[in-house]
Every structure is written in structure tokens, then in C-alpha cells.
Amino acid sequence: MTTQFDNVSVVKKANIYFDGKCVSHTVLFADGTKKTIGIIFPSTLKFNTGAAEIMELNAGKCRIRLAGATEWNTYEGGQQFEVPANSSFDIETVDTLDYVCHFI
């Protein structure tokens, strides 16, 4: 996992979801790809996906339950998890979660 992204454009307007519990900014790359960099404050939320995603966790800890699953899996800073396209996942955070969402 890289510690910085070079030669990118950042959308100034924040993406604010769930009454401010999740805040991110979109990062645009020269090759046309995009990522979001953000934080999720302590909460339990459900996210829907359009594109497949890799959620890279920089700091914090969370529990994830993918659509159709019954079990929760725990992830923390330095780990990542993948979510299929046109799906959803539940996320529970106790501490603030710092993440990068890679759209794949």
C-alpha cells in the first residue's frame, strides 16, 4: 500500500453520507481511474456498490458483513477487503476509520 498519490486531481467538494458519519473526497488519476479517501466515524452503516471496490484501511478497526453473508469479519489498519459490483455491505466502526476506496 502506497503512502501517497502523485500527479492527481482532487475534487474539492466533499462526499458526505449518513448525516456526516462518512466523509470522503474523490481523487482523479490521469489514466481515468478514481478513488475516494475518507473517514467513517463510529457507527453502523450499510453501503451499496455500483462498481466493485477494494477498501484499503489506513487506520482504525471495523467489522464487515458482505451482502448475503451471516458472519461479520474484522479488519483493521493495514488490511483491505473487496466488495463485488452491484452489491452491498454492512460496516460497524467503534473508532474513526481512515480508508481509501479503490474502484475496480
From Swiss-Prot:
Entry-linked Gene3D superfamilies: Jelly Rolls (2.60.120.10)
Record's catalysed reaction(s): a purine D-ribonucleoside + phosphate = a purine nucleobase + alpha-D-ribose 1-phosphate; adenosine + phosphate = alpha-D-ribose 1-phosphate + adenine; cytidine + phosphate = cytosine + alpha-D-ribose 1-phosphate; guanosine + phosphate = alpha-D-ribose 1-phosphate + guanine
Coiled-coil spans in chain: none
Keyword DNA damage: no
EC category: transferase
GO molecular function, one term: thymidine phosphorylase activity
Keywords: Glycosyltransferase, Transferase
Source organism, top-level taxon: Bacteria
Cited CDD domains: cupin_PpnP-like
GO CC, any one term: cytosol
Function: Catalyzes the phosphorolysis of diverse nucleosides, yielding D-ribose 1-phosphate and the respective free bases. Can use uridine, adenosine, guanosine, cytidine, thymidine, inosine and xanthosine as substrates. Also catalyzes the reverse reactions.
Family the entry assigns: Belongs to the nucleoside phosphorylase PpnP family.
Annotated protein name in UniProt: Pyrimidine/purine nucleoside phosphorylase
Gene that encodes it: ppnP
